[in-house]
């Protein structure tokens, strides 16, 4: 009996170690911002697809296949957030007045409520492009976040910038592997209209100074030679090529500092950075900032002003 108990204890210890090796994430991944992207209430097919598109933007640090049921509450997702290292909750809701988008810092807030002024799904954005970027490896790393014009008076602007920046992993410029930067999220704030434009791009690099024919061969693309008498004509007469590629202005040219996986980009030579839109597109307007998680003191409201703020405005006038 004693030997059986010892073997059972050893087996349980081995199982515990195995579970740790399977589920234990590296510390870098644990520290990276994770998110839940969900919807609440009744929404249409278009908005449901937008939820899926936004999850795609937030990959790989999001629950891409998260199932949301009517009986689920915000508390349910908060309870899951701790064990799964989730730091942000993104919620799409629809009502008679329009569509709202909430971003909350877990577990205690703050919460920012945006009005979704306009949006375009990824499939609509991609279908409008002549060249479509289809590469599953694009989503193996988090996107680079670029924010423009998030400056000015008001605590809410700084809160917006901080909230959006903290939704994505920080990048160490001196240690970053350029092969990991495959996507970019661009956010632009217009202080006059108070609107935020959200765009999502794929980033590619191509060698500079090569003819169209040579570039196709270097990048391992199989060229169509049916319209040419020989290979020389293909290489020396680029105007006959059907592909309307062009050399961008020198402002998009950079010197390659690292070895890149993409073909033709050699360290120390110039390459051109190209961006292809992936979608979705969002136009947002900040409506409200709450101190807590979907509740608490209202720190900012676009349409309802506190008495102190009204006094300050009257003094200025």
Regions found by a protein language model. Name each.
Residues 1-317:
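Phospho-regulatory, Ser/Thr- and acidic-rich intrinsically disordered linkers and terminal tails
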């Amino acid at each position: 009996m004693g030997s059986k108990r010892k073997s059972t204890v050893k087996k349980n210890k081995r199982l515990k170690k195995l579970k740790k090796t399977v589920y234990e994430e590296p510390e870098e991944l644990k520290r990276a911002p994770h998110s839940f992207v969900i919807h609440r209430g009744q929404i249409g097919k278009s908005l449901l697809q937008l939820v899926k598109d936004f999850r795609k933007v937030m990959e790989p640090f999001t629950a891409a296949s998260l199932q949301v049921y009517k009986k689920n509450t915000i508390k349910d997702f908060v309870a899951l957030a701790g064990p799964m290292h989730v730091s942000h909750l993104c919620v799409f809701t629809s009502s008679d007045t329009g569509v709202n988008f909430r971003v909350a810092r877990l577990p205690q807030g703050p919460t920012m409520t945006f009005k979704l002024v306009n949006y375009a799904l990824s499939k609509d954005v991609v279908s409008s492009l002549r060249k479509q970027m289809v590469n599953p490896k694009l989503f193996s790393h988090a996107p680079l976040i670029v924010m423009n014009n998030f400056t000015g008076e008001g605590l809410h602007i700084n809160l917006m910038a901080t909230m959006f920046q903290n939704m994505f992993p920080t990048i160490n410029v001196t240690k970053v592997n350029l092969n990991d930067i495959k996507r970019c999220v661009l956010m632009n704030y217009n202080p006059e209209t108070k609107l935020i434009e959200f765009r999502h791009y794929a980033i590619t690099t191509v060698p500079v100074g090569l003819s169209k024919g040579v570039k196709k061969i270097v990048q391992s693309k199989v060229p169509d030679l049916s319209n040419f008498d020989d290979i020389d004509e293909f290489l020396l007469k680029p105007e006959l090529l059907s592909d309307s590629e062009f050399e961008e202005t020198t402002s998009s040219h950079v010197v390659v500092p690292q070895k890149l996986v993409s073909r033709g980009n050699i360290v120390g030579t110039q390459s051109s950075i190209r961006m292809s839109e992936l979608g979705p597109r969002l136009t947002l307007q900040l409506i409200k900032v709450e101190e807590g998680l979907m509740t608490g003191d209202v720190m900012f409201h676009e349409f309802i002003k506190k008495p102190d703020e009204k006094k300050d405005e009257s003094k200025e006038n």
